[in-house]
UniProtKB/Swiss-Prot annotation:
CDD domains: F1-ATPase_gamma. It comes from Brucella canis (strain ATCC 23365 / NCTC 10854 / RM-666). Gene3D superfamilies: 3.40.1380.10, ATP synthase, gamma subunit, helix hairpin domain. Belongs to the ATPase gamma chain family. The keyword Ion transport applies. This is ATP synthase gamma chain. Its main location: membrane. The gene is atpG. Keywords: ATP synthesis, Cell inner membrane, Cell membrane, CF(1), Hydrogen ion transport, Ion transport, Membrane, Transport.
Length: 292
């Protein structure tokens, strides 16, 4: 049984930890608002660009279609771009994204495909390195980035396009977590290359309107698709930041509550033990007085 001194030390230690988790919760809550606004602001632009691409793609086919849109015609080599957070203490946020990428990689390997992985964020790299260390092609470190900007996504996009032009892969898939709410972040896989319009974009282009493009659609696509790849990566990074802050706020709230419960239990144990000690001392005093 721990002594009263040990119990006091444990209570003080848990209270100190509770102050830290409470402060981290408040910081995450403040950052979450800004991150959520940024993620929500990026969605309409990303979706409209997808709609424009889908519309233009209807007018381009065959040899005129850019390679980034039609691909190599093969799917032997797959590049997985896995975006996670640089730091932990955010519950299962990072592990859920890594698990989705890991399951996809296992499936491809079972089919005899070649898999290459680019990780964005330290936590995802640490998780995937345990099983796929030989498949890790590159790592993007954003730890020193104070404010995420489009230029960071553009650099990743240029790196991916350069690898494609060098014939390093046939299909590229982006993994990130789509922010739904503070308690809900959905791990998502999105194909970047060959560029494919999502269902929402296809629905938007299903009308009867006829568009004319200058210059020709193929030339527009050649410029727009690389831009769209960077836009989709930027949106994924913004979604990740919002999801990370939401998960961190929730995790720190749970940690603060658990610390409070532990303090209550330790305090009850301390008071009971102290009361028992006082009672014992009183009995000893009374017994001594009676003996006299």
């Amino acid at each position: 049984m721990p002594s009263l001194k040990d119990l006091r030390n444990r209570i003080a230690s848990v209270k100190a930890t509770q102050k830290i988790t409470k402060a981290m919760q408040m910081v995450a809550a403040a950052k979450l608002r800004r991150a959520q606004e940024a993620a929500e602001a990026a969605r309409p632009y990303s979706q409209r660009m997808g709609a424009v691409l889908a519309n233009i793609a209807q007018n381009v086919s065959g040899e005129d279609a850019p390679a980034l849109m039609v691909g190599t015609g093969k799917d032997n080599v797959h590049l997985l771009v896995v975006c996670t957070a640089e730091r932990g203490l955010c519950g299962g946020f990072n592990s859920q994204i890594a698990r989705l990428a890991r399951d996809h990689a296992r499936k491809l390997l079972a089919e005899g495909k070649t898999v290459k992985i680019i990780t964005v964020g330290k936590k995802g790299a640490d998780i995937l390195r345990r099983e796929f260390s030989a498949l890790l092609h590159d790592h993007v470190d954003l730890r020193e980035v104070k404010q995420l900007a489009f230029v960071h996504a553009d650099q990743i996009g240029h790196k991916i396009i350069k690898l494609f032009e060098e014939g390093a892969f046939d299909v590229c898939t982006l993994f990130y977590s789509e922010f739904k709410s503070v308690i809900s972040q959905v791990p998502t896989a999105q194909q970047l290359i060959p560029a494919s319009a999502d269902n929402e974009a296809e629905m938007e282009t299903a009308g009867d309107a006829i568009y004319e493009y200058e210059p020709d659609p193929a030339a527009i696509l050649s410029t727009l698709i690389p831009r769209n790849i960077s836009v989709q990566i930027f949106r994924a990074l913004l979604e990740n930041v919002a999801g990370e802050m939401g998960a961190k706020m929730s995790a720190m709230d749970n940690a603060t509550r658990n610390a409070g419960d532990m303090i209550n239990k330790l305090s009850i144990t301390y008071n009971r033990q102290r009361q028992a000690q006082i009672t014992k001392e009183l009995i000893e005093i009374i017994s001594g007085a009676e003996a006299l």
